[in-house]
Amino acid sequence: MAVYGIVATVLVLLLLGDASDVEATGRIIGGSDQLIRNAPWQVSIQISARHECGGVIYSKEIIITAGHCLHERSVTLMKVRVGAQNHNYGGTLVPVAAYKVHEQFDSRFLHYDIAVLRLSTPLTFGLSTRAINLASTSPSGGTTVTVTGWGHTDNGALSDSLQKAQLQIIDRGECASQKFGYGADFVGEETICAASTDADACTGDSGGPLVASSQLVGIVSWGYRCADDNYPGVYADVAILRPWIVKAANAI
């Protein structure tokens, strides 16, 4: 699993003392094509006219994504592509009016890695563009979840078409234990972990949705290497962060 974004480089140096395995771009490993009408809440966040991160439709005006995707970036450079099978064409491209990153976001450890943005014009919902409900309880260990995004595929190239992969939730305590390679300092109380043999999500998928039973349970945050059994994917826990999401969405 690659580290999801340049902001996590310090984290890798602290964790392993060696940044040689850091990948500048990542991928959904072991994924398959996902029709946008089967994940109509998925969006592509574009910065300087290219895909930067995934995002999730919360309402006609609000998108949820990872904090590190927007942190200290200029809103004038941001647009969101919605209702598109491909990140680089189709659907509707909407400018961003404003965004808010969680006040406790930590770019060093990627704790509280959550943000919301407000679109300049409201979306029109349809088969390929729709909001998703937020989970009210954190998923238990062993829950099957689906992650989607346009990150690089197994051949190392950015995927033009939306991809999906099925994973299983790993209990937070287990993820932070010596069974895996992170430790308690890196797996915060506001995170959940998920993994599967030969399947994973990485950099280009940051900010995208982790879904169970048609509810948003997580936001792709960070990890190390791709589909490495010792390093599960780490996601912002939507149930834990739900009060902040609702408040920020109403205030922005």
Curated annotation (Swiss-Prot):
Give any Gene Ontology cellular component: extracellular region
Task: Report whether Glycoprotein shows up as a keyword of the record.
Answer: no
Keyword set includes Signal? yes
Q: Which residues form the propeptide?
A: 20-27
Q: Looking at its record, which EC class is this enzyme?
A: hydrolase
Q: What is its main location?
A: secreted
Q: Name one GO biological process term.
A: proteolysis
Cysteine pairs bridged by disulfides in the record = C53-C69, C175-C193, C202-C226
E.C. numbers: 3.4.21.4
Q: Name one Pfam family in it.
A: Trypsin
Residues in the active site?
H68 (charge relay system), D113 (charge relay system), S206 (charge relay system)
Secretion signal, residue range per the UniProt entry = 1-19
Q: Which spans of this chain does the record mark as coiled coil?
A: none
Q: Where is it located?
A: Secreted, Extracellular space
Q: Which residues bear the site annotation Required for specificity?
A: D200
Database matches in SUPFAM superfamilies: Trypsin-like serine proteases
UniProt record similarity statement = Belongs to the peptidase S1 family.
| UniProt name for this protein | Trypsin iota
Highest lineage ranks of the organism? Eukaryota, Metazoa, Ecdysozoa, Arthropoda, Hexapoda
Name of the encoding gene: iotaTry
